[in-house]
Amino acid sequence: VFFPQKSQVQHFTVYRKLFLDVAANSHSRGVANISQTSSISEQSIHRKVGFAKKHQYTLALLVILAIFGAAALYNLGYMSVQWDEMPHLYGAVMLTHGQTWDYMKTYGYYPPVFDLITTGYFQIFGATQVAGRLVAVTFSLLAIAVLFAFAKKTYGAKNALIACVLLGTMPGFFWLTRVTMLETMLIFFFTLVMFVFYSWITKDTYKTLIFSGLALGIGVLAKYQIIVAAIAMLLSILFLCRNRLKISLAKFLAILLIVVLVAVPWFVMVYQYNGATKFQTLQYVMTEGGQDRPAYSNRFQPIPIFYLIEMTWPFNDIPVNPISLPILVLGLCGLGLFAYRRKKQDIFFLTWFMVVYVFFTLIPNRQWRYVTTLFPILAVSAACFIMFLYSRVRLWKPKQAGLKGSRQKKLAAAFFIVIIASLVAYASYDTYKMTARDQIHIPIQEATDYLAGHLDQNQSAVVVCSFNLLSEDMFRFYLPYSMSRDQIWQYPDLPVDSFKPNFNITEFLNLCQERNVKYIILFDWGPHTTFFNTTLDYAQVQTMIYDTHRFGDPQDQPFFGDFANNKGYRLFLVRFLG
């Protein structure tokens, strides 16, 4: 009992040995598993780091797009609607309600792509001014992304990233991002056309050929002025395709054929909807515009420097510019560098800049928004000039050798980077000023909601003295679908800040009676601010109205808005007594 037999001792020894062997194997496998897990973790980290290094500029672009998008979306709906936004906002409302005939009859002279996309946004987000402005934000982000791809292909990722930063901080570009206008779509399609056409010149594939035609054709339906790209294409072929000139010209005709096939159906449709009148309207808008345009457009004549000054100083009230002056100078210096180097891509960008500049200089009606297609070109040229200067700083050899000379070189490089960063910050501040300048809220929606609840079907309201921030279409935009658009109208017919008004009080009274007016809509702007090309002001108009003793009911005088900063943005609804 107390002493095991010999066989039992032997079995115990065997079991003990097996147990120790299993434990040892388990320990070794555990160490191996830990080592393998650690190795896998290190490999994963290395892969992530490698991915980040490989795509560092693309990741930086995403950060830029996120910052730009957040800034563009901030308080997007606060600013009152601009006059030039209404054809697209109200036109999209018409299309949403299926009023195609009314749309074509009213806004048929505008290209359709922007309005169609705005209609789609209205279907998703609702018919609001924010939804309309989201279209502009979308195409601004797309324009920056396409510019990055194009500049990366031609000048490398660093230049591309700098170009995107410069474009995003251009005051005019950012301002256009926050309004429902065509220009951001124009910049996107123009940059896309440049990109795919340059790809066709360098590779000459049928894919890029067809895509060039499609991009230009759709671009024409987005903004008619993009047709100037066809001239730039032709000159680019003459300058860059001399070895295969005949074949390239023949293929260029194929591009034009694609453009015709894409765009002509729209013009045929426009012609069917009282097209002769619409084409005359389009010609008038392109060549003349408002009565205020000739004096503004003919500044600095006959010297063709209008747009050089216009792009950096178009406003008289505050020093705000569509392109910050230091960035414009860098861009022009970059174009000079292109002319000096004459690389293939340099000639391409320089050609497109000159074509756009000369073309729109020759058109009588001039404004900085017409040459927004130059913005991406100037952004690229400025980025190239910055990198050119930086390369010279890097190659600079101080007279003092050794550690002291190395420090001087590093200080010079750091100082250069600080200067460029300061210029970008200055451009960003200009962007803020230009955006803040128009942060005016006029309570049109609130007044329209009141009118919708207090007008019978046979009654109307009239906007007195419309201007850039107040028009009949702005009220119609907020009207319920059940109300007729004819229940809101304006007198005089044309805006008083762009056309010399003819305010005839007798005619005004007769129209109020004919259209069964219940309210006239008055705006609380500067009472002694004179209208265009006349000494007539708002105070005189109000005096003429009140002297008739046919307006004003003490029991019914609603108003909307607040009086702030010594300038009111209020709307008054004054009862017409008949």
Language-model-detected regions and their locations in the chain:
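Transmembrane alpha-helix segments characteristic
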Residues: L62-G69, T191, L216, A232-L234, ...
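Short periplasmic/luminal acceptor-recognition loop of GT-C membrane glycosyltransferases, typified by
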Residues: L451-Y491, P495, K518-H528, F572-L573
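Short acidic/glycine- and proline-prone juxtamembrane loop motifs at membrane-interface regions
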Residues: Q82-W83, A136, G172-M185, Q367
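Transmembrane-helix motifs of polytopic, lipid-linked glycan transferases
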Residues: A66, L134-Y155, L192, V196, ...
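Transmembrane alpha-helical segments
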Residues: A412-I442, S484-W489
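Membrane-interface transmembrane helices that cradle and orient dolichyl/undecaprenyl
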Residues: K152-T154, K158, V193-L209, G219, ...
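Aromatic/acidic, Gly/Pro-rich catalytic loop(s) in extracytoplasmic/lumenal soluble domains
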Residues: A382, T506-G578
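Transmembrane-lumen/periplasm boundary regions of multi-pass, lipid-linked membrane glycan transferases
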Residues: N75, H88-G91, I218, I227-R341, ...
